[in-house]
Amino acid sequence: MLGKEIGKDQRQKRIQDIILRESVSTQAELVKLLAKEGVQVTQATVSRDINELRLVRVPIGKGRHRYALAQYGGDSDIEEQLARLFQSFVQDVDRGENILVIRTADGHASGVALLLDRWKRDDIVGTLAGEDTIMVVARSTHDGESLMEEFNALMLG
């Protein structure tokens, strides 16, 4: 079957549909599943789509993970999800004045950062996530201290 030329929005919608119905652990698997639907795409493009869609990797047991759409049901739900993610994937939190650096397991920074952004806290100016590191900018040094305490509490449960 020849690959279809589809736009970015359609491709990302297909990715979301696949993630909802299949257990996809890797970008390579997602490329293959898209190809089965006639959508030819590179792994680099899938990687960008995953980041733009802010897909999260969730544990499915025995050290395995799968991609999932982030679900939100309000602030308390976000706090519960943050606690689970911090306990499962955050390895360290450090602070310098009003900037905090959160180190996560590989591939989990964007999922944690997304929830921090959705938390809509006045004391958080914004976040920037890489593959395994998140920079959180607090509004003030005092806010940075408070956030450091909260993040450490989230890690401990």
Curated annotation (Swiss-Prot):
GO terms for biological process: L-arginine biosynthetic process; protein complex oligomerization; regulation of arginine biosynthetic process; regulation of arginine metabolic process. GO terms for cellular component: cytoplasm; transcription regulator complex. It is found in: Cytoplasm. It holds the Pfam family Arg_repressor. Keywords: Amino-acid biosynthesis, Arginine biosynthesis, Cytoplasm, DNA-binding, Repressor, Transcription, Transcription regulation. Its main location: cytoplasm. It comes from the Bacteria. SUPFAM superfamilies: C-terminal domain of arginine repressor (SSF55252), Winged helix' DNA-binding domain (SSF46785). Pathway: Amino-acid biosynthesis; L-arginine biosynthesis [regulation]. The keyword Protein biosynthesis does not apply. InterPro entries: Arg_repress (IPR001669), Arg_repress_C (IPR020899), Arg_repress_C_sf (IPR036251), Arg_repress_DNA-bd (IPR020900), WH-like_DNA-bd_sf (IPR036388), WH_DNA-bd_sf (IPR036390). Regulates arginine biosynthesis genes. HAMAP family: Arg_repressor. Belongs to the ArgR family. This is Arginine repressor. It comes from Deinococcus radiodurans (strain ATCC 13939 / DSM 20539 / JCM 16871 / CCUG 27074 / LMG 4051 / NBRC 15346 / NCIMB 9279 / VKM B-1422 / R1). The gene is argR.
